[in-house]
């Protein structure tokens, strides 16, 4: 930074926090997405406990984590992408200034009317005679895909036979364009994750006008309307909601659903680039005082 005309240094990922200079001449801000690796934990989900973060990092990773924590301690302000992350940060770094700046969603990219994608792009993974439900994400334990499988297995037979379940990212790899297609055409996204730093898939689904059924858990429950949230471990509550989705699909004659404009508007109001820009500007002003 020596000789630079910069007013502020922003490191946008805590995994690079070791780069925070010592005795920096300008304020240093670091964005913290989550503390899953700095503060690994187990979260109870019904009668099981789900690990979040690496419970037993190796020698080199432990050394890295120590350097990252020291870098975060040197920063002047920690930007957090969710209220949950903000609470975690304030517990780990008491007295450290924090600011909430959520991620942004590119509404134009997901827009089902302004940027529509043909369902034909999913042909090799799809059955357009059935009610398409999707999950998006890895198969790590905290994503709880086994819970979704339990839900599907518990559906009435006449409903289950009409369901085409597509697990994107964990079982099927899609291109970026195919992912847009899936979110624009699925009858619903199922998102049972037990813990997220933010929760991109449901936010992107809503931007595409796709109904969301999600576990009422942090931090994704901060950015999802209450009507889309269900108890995380209540299989029958999820079954009932899927049955409703199927019934609506059946009543429509199996034709593609209309985009849910209320969900698109929800994302526009809270997660647009403009909303993020305003929050980021306020955070920078705080750091530069």
Which positions does each model-derived feature cover?
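Carbohydrate transferase catalytic cores enriched for Leloir-type hexosyltransferases
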Residues: 1-289
């Amino acid at each position: 930074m020596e000789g630079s005309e910069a007013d502020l240094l922003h490191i946008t990922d805590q995994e690079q926090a070791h780069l925070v200079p010592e005795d920096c001449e300008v304020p240093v801000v670091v964005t913290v997405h989550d503390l899953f690796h700095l503060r690994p934990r187990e979260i109870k989900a019904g009668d099981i406990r789900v690990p979040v973060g690496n419970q037993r990092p190796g020698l080199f990773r432990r050394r890295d984590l120590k350097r990252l924590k020291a870098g975060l301690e040197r920063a002047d302000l920690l930007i957090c992408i969710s209220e949950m992350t903000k609470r975690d940060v304030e517990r780990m770094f008491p007295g450290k200034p924090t600011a909430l700046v959520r991620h942004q969603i590119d509404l134009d990219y997901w827009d089902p009317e302004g940027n529509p994608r043909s369902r034909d792009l999913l042909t090799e993974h799809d059955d357009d005679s059935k009610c398409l439900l999707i999950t998006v994400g890895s198969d790590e334990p905290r994503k709880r895909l086994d819970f979704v499988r339990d839900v599907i297995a518990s559906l009435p037979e006449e409903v289950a036979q009409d369901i085409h379940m597509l697990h994107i990212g964990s079982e099927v790899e899609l291109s970026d364009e195919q992912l847009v297609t899936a979110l624009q055409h699925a009858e619903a996204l199922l998102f049972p994750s037990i813990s997220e730093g933010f929760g991109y898939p449901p936010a992107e689904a809503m931007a595409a006008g796709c109904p969301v059924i999600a576990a009422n858990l942090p931090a994704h429950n901060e950015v999802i309307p209450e009507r889309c949230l269900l108890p995380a471990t209540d299989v029958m509550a999820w079954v009932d909601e899927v049955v409703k989705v199927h019934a609506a699909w059946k009543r429509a004659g199996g034709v593609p659903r209309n985009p849910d404009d209320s969900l698109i508007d929800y994302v526009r109001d809270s997660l647009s680039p403009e909303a993020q820009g305003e929050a980021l500007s306020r955070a920078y002003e705080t750091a530069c005082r």
